[in-house]
């Protein structure tokens, strides 16, 4: 027999007139087969008081033989829809079926207890997020023992606040909610709308996040409100994986959140709509010692929405009272009106009681831009805002820290054209940072542990920002993970001067794990190697192309792969990991340990001028790695002579520099390298691995003198480079002074022009006044002449 699926009729849908809440002050006697929900003498008093929050008591599993294993049955004699729905409580936590009067079967879940403390603690007037966790709850109460004699560990309401502190940045909380909406694309979502609305109760501002995705049925709604549950971790191409984002993000933006969700029926089930309230204000004000979430569920029957009661009608009424009292809506009818604003499916999240800063103003700024949500405080830099208007290609770098519109435009590497992100009535235009770059290069990076090349690899697009010729201090890598921006403009190279300016990059690294707040990555060896590799890329790119954007060409400098200063620059990074970056340091082998026939020939002046790095004693894996003593001295195992002592006596200045060295770098491109952390032996070409005996005599002295001369020449070259840098610095300072002088001159000229303009205005005014007076005199003379002529004409006429 085909199952009967009831279709929703959008024309006759009504959420207000078809069902009315039962009377709050009326006690309904339960049927004989239903267990009375009571474990306290105060139950009747709490049920009669409308101002107090009622409690859904748990069933006493140890109080009588006839109670254990008994299921609550439905009474078909109850007339109203609310009374007609009684629930059976199973022995375990699995899903169970509610049989309706028509014989249909409804899938439901056990009710979540809503424990209430009669003596509420003071909430206080603290509306600052970082101080909201400082409150004293009530002392410990009776601990319930669940089935099997195991204790049920409570989750204190303070955990909601401490859990939300993982978001140091409020816009990161918005990103979590946008991730949830984007994941609904697989369920048919075409938009997510973020807006600011007014609270009708007190006129305060609230945040609205809504989408037209698949919605949540009662079971998914309870999973959403739970901690740590995530079905997305098993799905491909989804961002969420920890089951913690909704709670941390909403509690970071405001103290309370209410969720409305409507879901279409599947597999013969009816459509459902649910309301869930996660209120930190409610939990603190009532002195809760456990997190409880009032929820209301409704089921579509023909053209009517009927409530789904999970324990009893009185418990349903208590949940309704709790939601109405602590939500922004005054009645249950106003709550149900929110479902009229969505279509057949979707979710509306409303965050209210938004957090304030130390000055008593909202952390979020809704007034500066009517189509944006911005941050106040340290994340907002007025200088960057002015620069963003001057340098449009660097706008996202300068504004993403305080502007949600700017941050949301670069939040995803790729986004479907059919999906819209609407922020306060205006679409957010997706932006690819690559479009802001010039002279781009693409480099494929594969980590050492790469097993699947298609998944564990990253294509790094690196280039100059188009405003780099203005020497704007913009640099960093935008690192994405599964299409989501995790590290915006990650600054890796912290050079002392202007090195690295203007170099930006984009990559998607799916082989590193993001942190829980998705604003960084877990510190692992893989991340350290990626960081070191990106540092090499940026240095190579900068030193080969910096002259194209107006900087002096770095002559005589080595590339990032060969320079001995890589380690020092790497250590200057704020996220430096000595263990993780050890493999990227260089190893050197003094040429005095090699026979003349095995000595390498240097093909370039740069390679020939490499100096010995005294810190090269690093035990790292990789091809060609060598373990060498930190001191140049080497004790011969055959004669016991000290080469280091004779070397230091011959030339003390040459000791720290050492002899000519061969440098071998370890990069992640060497896939066939040994994975062991240390190798003590290096095979030299054409020779055995045994070290030769140290030489002595005039030949050794002449060799040392020759090497000393070479060291002096290299030192002179370094001094030339240093002088060149000093020259660049002086030129920059002179340029700055010149610009400052020009600015001052322009200011003086502007003042003079203002004075000249004022004097010209005065002259013109005087001329106008003088001209007016002359015109007046001429007018008077003209009138007198006219009168004289008229008199003469009249006299002549009379004489005739």
UniProtKB/Swiss-Prot annotation:
**Biological processes per GO annotation:** defense response; DNA repair; gene silencing by siRNA-directed DNA methylation; positive regulation of defense response to oomycetes; regulation of DNA repair; regulation of gene silencing by regulatory ncRNA
State the name under which the record lists this protein: Protein MICRORCHIDIA 4
Biased composition of type Acidic residues is found at 666-675
- UniProt lists compositionally biased (Polar residues) regions at 9-18
Task: Provide the family line.
Answer: Belongs to the MORC ATPase protein family.
User: Is Isomerase there in the keyword field?
Assistant: no
**Where along the chain is composition biased (Low complexity)?**
36-47
The record's Pfam families line, in alphabetical order, gives:
HATPase_c_3, Morc6_S5
Q: Which co-factors does it depend on?
A: Mg(2+); Mn(2+)
Ranges of Basic and acidic residues composition bias in the record: 559-578, 628-641
Q: What class of enzyme is it?
A: hydrolase
List the residue ranges forming a coiled coil, or say none.
Answer: 699-766
One GO MF annotation is: endonuclease activity
**EC numbers for this chain:** 3.6.-.-
Localization in the cell: Nucleus
Q: From which organism does this entry originate?
A: Arabidopsis thaliana (Mouse-ear cress)
Keywords of the record = ATP-binding, Chromatin regulator, Coiled coil, DNA damage, DNA repair, DNA-binding, Endonuclease, Hydrolase, Kinase, Nuclease, Nucleotide-binding, Nucleus, Plant defense, RNA-binding, RNA-mediated gene silencing, Transferase
Q: Which segment of this protein is annotated as the motif Nuclear localization signal 2?
A: 735-742
Q: Where is this region: Disordered?
A: 1-76, 552-702
Q: Where is this motif: Nuclear localization signal 1?
A: 716-723
Quaternary structure?
Answer: Homodimer and heterodimer. Component of an RNA-directed DNA methylation (RdDM) complex. Forms homomeric complexes.
State its role: Exhibits ATPase activity. Binds DNA/RNA in a non-specific manner and exhibits endonuclease activity. Probably involved in DNA repair. Involved in RNA-directed DNA methylation (RdDM) as a component of the RdDM machinery and required for gene silencing. May also be involved in the regulation of chromatin architecture to maintain gene silencing. Together with MORC7, acts to suppress a wide set of non-methylated protein-coding genes, especially involved in pathogen response. Positive regulator of defense against the oomycete Hyaloperonospora arabidopsidis (Hpa).
């Amino acid at each position: 027999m085909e199952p009967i699926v009831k279709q929703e009729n959008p024309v006759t849908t009504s959420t207000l007139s078809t069902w009315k809440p039962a009377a709050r002050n009326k006690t309904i006697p339960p049927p004989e087969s239903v267990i009375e929900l009571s474990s306290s003498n105060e139950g009747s008093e709490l049920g009669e008081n409308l101002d107090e929050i009622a409690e859904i008591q748990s069933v006493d599993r140890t109080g009588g033989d006839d109670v254990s294993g008994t299921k609550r049955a439905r009474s078909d004699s109850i007339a109203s829809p609310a009374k007609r729905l009684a629930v059976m409580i199973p022995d375990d936590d699995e899903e169970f079926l509610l049989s309706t009067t028509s014989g249909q079967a409804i899938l439901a879940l056990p009710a979540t207890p809503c424990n209430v403390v009669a003596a509420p603690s003071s909430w206080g007037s603290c509306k600052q997020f970082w101080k909201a966790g400082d409150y004293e709850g009530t002392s410990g109460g009776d601990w319930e023992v669940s089935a099997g004699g195991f204790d049920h560990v409570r989750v204190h309401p303070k955990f909601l606040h401490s859990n939300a502190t993982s978001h140091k940045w409020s816009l990161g909380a918005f990103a979590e909610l946008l991730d949830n909406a984007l994941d609904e694309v697989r369920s048919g979502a075409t938009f997510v709308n973020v807006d600011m609305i007014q609270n009708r109760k007190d006129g305060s501002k609230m945040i609205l996040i809504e989408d037209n995705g698949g919605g949540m049925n009662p079971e998914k709604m309870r999973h959403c409100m739970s901690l740590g549950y995530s079905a997305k971790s098993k799905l491909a191409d989804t961002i969420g994986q920890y089951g913690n984002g909704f709670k941390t993000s909403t509690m970071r933006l405001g103290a309370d959140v209410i969720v409305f969700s409507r879901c279409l029926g599947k597999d013969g089930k009816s459509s459902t709509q649910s309301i869930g309230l996660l209120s930190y204000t409610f939990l603190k004000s009532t002195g809760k010692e456990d997190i409880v979430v009032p929820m209301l569920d409704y089921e579509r029957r023909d053209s009517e929405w009927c409530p789904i009661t999970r324990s009893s009608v009185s418990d349903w009424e208590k949940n309704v009272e709790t939601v109405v009292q602590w939500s922004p809506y005054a009645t249950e009818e106003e709550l149900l009106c929110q479902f009229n604003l969505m279509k057949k499916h979707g979710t509306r999240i409303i965050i209210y009681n938004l957090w304030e800063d130390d000055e008593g103003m909202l952390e979020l700024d809704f007034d500066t831009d009517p189509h944006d949500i911005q941050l106040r405080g340290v994340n907002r830099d007025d200088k960057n805002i002015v620069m963003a208007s001057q340098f449009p290609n660097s706008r996202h770098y300068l504004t993403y820290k305080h502007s949600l519109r700017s941050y949301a435009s670069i939040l995803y590497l790729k986004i479907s054209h059919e999906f819209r992100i609407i922020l306060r009535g205006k679409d957010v235009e997706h932006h690819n940072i690559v479009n802001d770059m010039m002279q781009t290069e693409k480099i494929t990076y594969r980590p050492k542990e790469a097993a699947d090349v298609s998944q564990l690899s990253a294509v790094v697009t690196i280039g100059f920002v188009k405003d780099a010729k203005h020497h704007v201090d913009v640099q960093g890598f935008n690192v994405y993970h599964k299409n989501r921006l995790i590290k915006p403009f990650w600054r890796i190279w912290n050079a002392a001067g202007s090195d690295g300016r203007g170099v930006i990059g984009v990559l998607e690294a799916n082989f590193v794990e993001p942190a829980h707040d998705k604003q960084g990555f877990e510190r692992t060896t893989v991340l350290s190697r990626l960081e070191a590799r990106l540092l090499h890329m940026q240095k190579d790119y900068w030193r080969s192309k910096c002259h194209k954007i107006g900087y002096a060409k770095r002559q005589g400098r080595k590339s990032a792969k060969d320079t001995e200063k890589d380690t020092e620059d790497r250590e200057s990074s704020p996220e430096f990991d000595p263990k993780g970056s050890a493999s990227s340091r260089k190893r050197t082998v003094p040429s005095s340990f090699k026979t003349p026939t095995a000595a390498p020939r240097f093909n370039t002046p740069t390679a020939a001028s490499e100096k010995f790095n005294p810190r090269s004693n690093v035990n790292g894996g990789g091809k060609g790695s060598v373990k060498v003593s930190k001191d140049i001295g080497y004790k011969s195992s055959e004669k016991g002579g000290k080469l280091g002592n004779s070397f230091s006596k011959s030339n003390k200045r040459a000791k720290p520099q050492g002899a000519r060295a061969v440098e071998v770098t370890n990069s992640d491109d060497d896939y066939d390298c040994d994975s062991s952390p240390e190798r003590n032996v290096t095979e030299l070409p054409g020779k055995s691995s045994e070290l030769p005996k140290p030489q002595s005599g005039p030949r050794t002295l002449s060799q040392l003198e020759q090497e000393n001369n070479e060291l002096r020449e290299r030192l002179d070259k370094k001094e030339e480079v240093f002088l060149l840098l000093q020259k660049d610095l002086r030129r920059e300072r002179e340029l700055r002074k010149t610009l400052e002088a020009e600015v001052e001159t322009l200011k003086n000229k502007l003042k003079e022009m203002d004075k000249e303009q004022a004097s010209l205005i005065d002259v013109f005014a005087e001329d106008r006044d003088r001209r007016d007076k002359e015109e007046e005199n001429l007018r008077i003379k003209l009138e007198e002449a006219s009168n004289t002529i008229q008199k003469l004409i009249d006299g002549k006429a009379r004489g005739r």
